[in-house]
Amino acid sequence: MSLDITKYPVLAQADTPDELRQLPQGVLPKLADELRSYLLQSVGISSGHFASGLGTVELTVALHYVYNTPFDRLIWDVGHQAYPHKILTGRRDKMPTIRQKGGIHPFPWREESEYDTFSVGHSGTSISAALAMAVAAEKEQAGRKVVAVIGDGAMTGGMVFEAMNHAGDLHNDMLVVLNDNEMSISENVGALNNHLAQLMSGRLYTTIRENSKKVLKGMPVIKEMAKRTEEHLKGMVVPGTMFEELGFNYIGPIDGHDVDALVETLRNMRNLSGPQILHIMTKKGRGYEPAEKDPIGWHAVPKFDPSTFAKPAAKPANPTFSQVFGRWLCDMAQKDDKVLGITPAMREGSGMVEFSQRFPNQYFDAAIAEQHAVTLAAGFACEGYKPVLAIYSTFLQRGYDQLIHDVALQKLPVIFAIDRGGIVGPDGPTHQGAFDLSYMRAIPNMVIMAPSDENECRQMLYTGYCYNEGPTAIRYPRGSATGEPQVETMTAYEIGKGLIKREGKKIAILNFGTTLASASQAAEALDATLADMRFVKPLDVELVKQLATSHDLLVTVEENAIMGGAGSGVLELLQQLKLPMPVLNIGLPDEFIKHGECGEILAELQLDGPGIEAQIRAYLAD
């Protein structure tokens, strides 16, 4: 389904930035209105990230109007806010396909467009990449400009400040636009600040500022007094001292929804030398009342009818694994005030809203700082607490050194509740939980569990709570659980023990995690033995030995990369046991998995029931 572009007469004239730059500046407010309306309608058709893009419409228009993209480099941090950028860079008609199998990518993606100068998906990467591009631009002497756009949420990550510290030291020409949509840094926005920003970015001010530095260079005492006076005067009206200390010239804050003010300020800043930061204030969900009132709820949305001002009612479904985790955490916190819940800024997604409200003194949001979150948990464990870190599989990668150095090395009893393990679907390769079993298996002292349903998930979390000899990881997928009736009684599993779910002949399927239902279909069709292994590490040695000595073929099934995954662990164990035999590893291939619906992807990868059966039959036929 496509949208009727005739309803957007100005937007129709701006399919690319080159066309946009041909428009008179006076029509830019109208263009912004049409762009916002088009975004609203297209996301209603496709689903996707929504509220962030509504807040960056005017900024996107102004950036492409002032800067000569793609020659000038524009890097978006994370990419949730980049839908307007996609619309203005030749992908307007494809927007209804975003995040769908075969459709355009959910984030800026280098393979998709020359305007996407850096592929993104995780937060905090833009300034590092922009700095490198700024250094390269100076080496080339081609007059290329570089801009990074980053949100105030991503500014909580340590990598951002590492990059800014380096940029301030190198002093290459670059602009960082701080899109502040939560009013977490400053509320000083209005006509005075807009005027001040244009004044401070103007040629007269910057010329006087730089010439004064040259004159005062030989008079250190007077120079220091002047510097302090300037900082004091600026500090009275702008919150930029921190950025100035990092070596950036700070401009702002200004209204990020005033496209004319943005254009004029960016024009001035385009010609400034050295690292610059422009602080803009925006409203997440701007222009659509429900999203303005509930920007978190409208951050990412399913398909909806914009005219109803409501998201579609959720279909009755089983609780999600995230909800199962959240309920378990509340149950445990009720019984034990030493239980602490930690999240790196994923409270809603990880199912921790109720916990944060009921147990505020036991809840810690570490912000978008995964390294800090892991070591925070380690510190709590040292003091006798029971820290539970709820973290997405793809984001735990960012705290890998801390997992090894600060947790596992010290055998600290931290519980890792790893959400979004396996295929996550529409968010694509930056968010698929494809590698956690592989990268955790290599770490000594780790206990790794993979539940097949919500009850096993609950019992495994409790097993982690009871285990004090080191860290435990419980890895579960995105989306609804299987619908098993909840078993209220919690019992810790014996570490490293699985169980046989079905007795068969010749073939034994060793399943790890929520692929159990699909593996069961294949086992029924093939009259195979089926084992629910439960533990990826340590493996159930006796069960593997028993299955290997009584079957002709072992098949491992997991929703993780085959390389280094649970199946690799089975092969390593068989080698140690000196039990050579045919083994078929079924899992994710050695490639980054593209976006699409989870069911579509699993079927394409032959990880559904028929696919597992087909892979086994093909192996036997060779």
UniProtKB/Swiss-Prot annotation:
Under catalytic activity, the entry for this protein gives: D-glyceraldehyde 3-phosphate + pyruvate + H(+) = 1-deoxy-D-xylulose 5-phosphate + CO2
Residues annotated for thiamine diphosphate binding in this entry: H80, G121, H122, S123, G153, A154, N181, Y288, E370
Q: In which pathway does it act?
A: Metabolic intermediate biosynthesis; 1-deoxy-D-xylulose 5-phosphate biosynthesis; 1-deoxy-D-xylulose 5-phosphate from D-glyceraldehyde 3-phosphate and pyruvate: step 1/1
Mind telling me which InterPro entries this protein's record contains?
Dxylulose-5-P_synthase, THDP-binding, Transketo_C/PFOR_II, Transketolase-like_Pyr-bd, Transketolase_BS, Transketolase_C, Transketolase_CS
Its EC top class is transferase
Q: Which cofactor does it need?
A: Mg(2+); thiamine diphosphate
Q: Which Gene3D superfamilies match?
A: 3.40.50.920, 3.40.50.970
Look up the EC number in the record and give it.
Answer: 2.2.1.7
Give residues annotated as binding Mg(2+). D152, N181
The biological processes this protein is annotated with in GO are: 1-deoxy-D-xylulose 5-phosphate biosynthetic process; isopentenyl diphosphate biosynthetic process, methylerythritol 4-phosphate pathway; terpenoid biosynthetic process; thiamine biosynthetic process
Q: Which CDD domains does the record match to this protein?
A: TPP_DXS, TPP_PYR_DXS_TK_like
Keywords, A to Z? Isoprene biosynthesis, Magnesium, Metal-binding, Thiamine biosynthesis, Thiamine pyrophosphate, Transferase
The record's annotation in SUPFAM superfamilies points to: Thiamin diphosphate-binding fold (THDP-binding) (SSF52518), TK C-terminal domain-like (SSF52922)
Q: Which family does it belong to?
A: Belongs to the transketolase family. DXPS subfamily.
Describe the protein's quaternary organization and the partners it interacts with.
Answer: Homodimer.
Name-wise, this protein is 1-deoxy-D-xylulose-5-phosphate synthase
Gene name of this polypeptide: dxs
